Structures are given as structure tokens and as C-alpha cells.
Amino acid sequence: MGSSEAETPAKANKASAPQEQQPPATSSTATPTVYPDWTSFQGYPPIPPHGFFPSPVVSNPQGHPYMWGPQPMMPPYGTPPYVIYPPGGIYAHPSMRPGAHPFAPYTMTSPNGNPDAAGTTITAATAGGETNGKSSEGKEKSPIKRSKGSLGSLNMITGKNCVEHGKTSGASANGTISQSGESGSESSSEGSEANSQNDSQHKESGQEQDGDVRSSQNGVSPSPSQAQLKQTLAIMQMPSSGPVPGPTTNLNIGMDYWANTASSSPALHGKVTPTAIPGAVAPTEPWMQDERELKRQKRKQSNRDSARRSRLRKQAECEELAQRAEVLKQENASLKDEVSRIRKEYDELLSKNSSLKDNVGDKQHKTDEAGLDNKLQHSGDDSQKDTN
């Protein structure tokens, strides 16, 4: 940060005059903690810290060479040595609070209710007649300029506001002050002194001009229009507008095309009336209700059709069974008639057979008797011949 002193141009004379009159005061920023026994944990020459993490105190955050040194091509045999960690961890600097740089993952709350990634508290600017933040010329937005100091110093981002007669603007987030002039930036040492003077003057004046000039977290002094954007707004749930309304349809479409129009069609029954339900939007469009009614009617019609088909199928089956029963009855009657006829014929045959048997028996008896008579006659004749 000391290299930025040589590259920044000189300040304006009008801007330096009020700075010299202000008495120095104690800075409100926290003093970084320096560990006195830091060298006892590290026996290696110090290396400049990484440029991404700026630090006002030159510290040696490097760890043990077994962690940061080059790895050998072949791992050594045996148990590797114990890795030594410096106090506070490798990446945690003792001189920086959580969220002390703009890209920190820790967010700190600011007075206006918005999370402040830089982790700093917004302070008021100089009080009294030196501050003219309410002037019309000071309402323009100031460009963000990055200081040309150290490589990773992101805390030196300062802003320039259009102020009349070389008067100072608000303090930046990291404790520096942007002043109006030719370049609009100054060195870090003079900025810290001006910050201490502004802090002491702010303590004396109180909070009378707290809302006049404020510095943002990136070092840009915002205009009143920007301050309005930082106000916390309540999140309101926007009601959904619903689907795009379409043409009104009903069940009579195509039925009364030549007789009635869509406006003269009868109203559908069973429409759902829109009710005030919290957290939901009632369907107030008529075409949505018509579509639901149409679907309901289609469902009912399909149910009726299926019931009618099943009823017709059962009726057809019953008719077929009745026809078959009639046919079977006729066949049964014809079979009964035939059986009765056959039985009559059988009876007739039995009677004829019995009559024939009787006739045959009579004739045979007569023949037997005639033959017996003949035998008797022959036997009588033979006996007479023998006696003679």
C-alpha cells in the first residue's frame, strides 16, 4: 500500500486546507493483532503474502514447507513428517476480520439493512459547513477508480463526487477518503489521517448529518438516488395472471350454429363460483369454467355410452337366450310327439304279435291232434292184423 503514494498526484490546495486544521483522533478501526511468537513456529525466511488477500500488516501466512514446497518425484519411505500449521490457520490472517475484503464469503449487516460483504460499518462524512452532499451538483454518480498501489489491494477503491469549491466527500469502506480535484484519489496514509479526523468530527457532531453523505462498501460515495436503492423493501407476492383467455366454448357448439349465437346459448349447469381463497387465484374466466364443464359433460356422456352399450349387450344376450329356449321347446315338443307315435306303433305290433302267436298255437294244436289220431289208427290196424 505504500507504493501507491508515489503514483498518486498531489492534492488540490483547497482540499488540503481543511484537512490540516482538523485535529488528529484515534481511528475507529480495529487494531490488527500481531503474534510475538510467530517466528517460533516458522524457521524459514518470510515470503510476501498472496496478492488476493490484502493486509495492512506485513505478515507471513506461509505454512510448513512440507505442505507448500514442491513434492518429490518418488515419495520417501516410512512415515511422512508431521505437518505444522501456523496459529490461526493457513488462510486466516490475524490482521483481517471475517469479510474484510469485498469478495469475502462472510457477510456483515450494515445500518441500512443490506448485507455488507466488506464487513465494515458505514460512517458519516465530515460535519458542519465542509459537507455539501445535498447540493444539486453533487447528485451525479461518480466513477469507480481502482488505486494503483499494491497488487491485490481491493480496499483502496475510492469514489469521487462532484463537490463545489474542493470540499470533501464521504469516507470510503476501508477507511480512506475520496477528494474532489484533478485526480480524485490520494495516498493511503493521508486517507487514514483524514479518516481519523472525520471520525473525531463525526463523534462531536453526532448523527445530525448521518444521512447526508455515506460511503458504500466498494468505496463509491453514492448519490441520494443510489441511497434510495439501498433501502430495504418488503417482498410482496405478485398474483399470477393465469393463462391467456381464449374463446368461450360450450356443449352446444355446432348444434345451434344456424339458429343461435354463442351469446344466446343456454348457461351450463354446475359452474364453480369463484371464492376468495388466500394464496390462490380463483378461475374467473368463463372459458375455463366452460372447459371444465365440457370435460365433465364428456365424462358423463362416456359413462352413459358405456352403460348403454353394456345394457344393449345384455339385452341382446337375453334375446338370444330366449330364442334358443323357444327353439329347444319346439324340438322337445316334436320329440315328444314322435315318442308317442312310436309308442303307439309298438303297442300295435305287440297286439299283432300276440294275435299271431294265438293263431299259430291253435293250428299247431290241431295238427298235433290229427297226427295223434293217425298214429292211433295205424296202431289199431296193426293189432288187428296180428290177431288174424
Swiss-Prot record:
GO terms for biological process: defense response; regulation of DNA-templated transcription. Keywords: DNA-binding, Nucleus, Plant defense, Stress response, Transcription, Transcription regulation. GO terms for cellular component: nucleus. The keyword DNA-binding applies. It is found in: Nucleus. Transmembrane segments: none annotated. Residues 23-33, 180-193 have a biased composition (Low complexity). The keyword ATP-binding does not apply. Induction: Induced during incompatible interaction with the fungal pathogen Puccinia striiformis. Induced by abscisic acid (ABA), ethylene, cold stress, salt stress and wounding. Its main location: nucleus. Residues 1-46, 126-249, 261-316, 348-388 are annotated as: Disordered. Residues 321-356 are annotated as: Leucine-zipper. Residues 169-179, 214-231 have a biased composition (Polar residues). It holds the Pfam family MFMR. Residues 302-316, 359-369, 375-388 have a biased composition (Basic and acidic residues). Coiled coil: none annotated. Residues 295-314 are annotated as: Basic motif. Residues 293-356 form the bZIP domain. Highly expressed in roots and at lower levels in stems and leaves. GO terms for molecular function: DNA-binding transcription factor activity; sequence-specific DNA binding; transcription cis-regulatory region binding. It comes from the Eukaryota. Belongs to the bZIP family. This is bZIP transcription factor 1-B. The gene is BZIP1-B.
